[in-house]
């Protein structure tokens, strides 16, 4: 499982943006297009290559007034999935 101190960032060539034509958020990767769900969008909006996973979890738990453990499970699962798809890279914090 991914450690909470890992820092997620978008891989080179990956763009996360709002597509006005489709009226939704999209992830553009080399030769790939992903349409993340609402939960993934909330997570990805906090991915900046600086924040640790724990910080992202804390922000979302406070924003949605939800149990931190549940948020952590969702965030880690989403980031691990996106990492396997080549969208996100997870770097150990130093």
Predicted regions and their residues:
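Acidic, low-complexity/disordered tracts enriched in E/D and polar residues
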Residues: 1-41, 45, 91-93
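Long, charge-rich, low-complexity alpha-helical segments
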Residues: 32-94
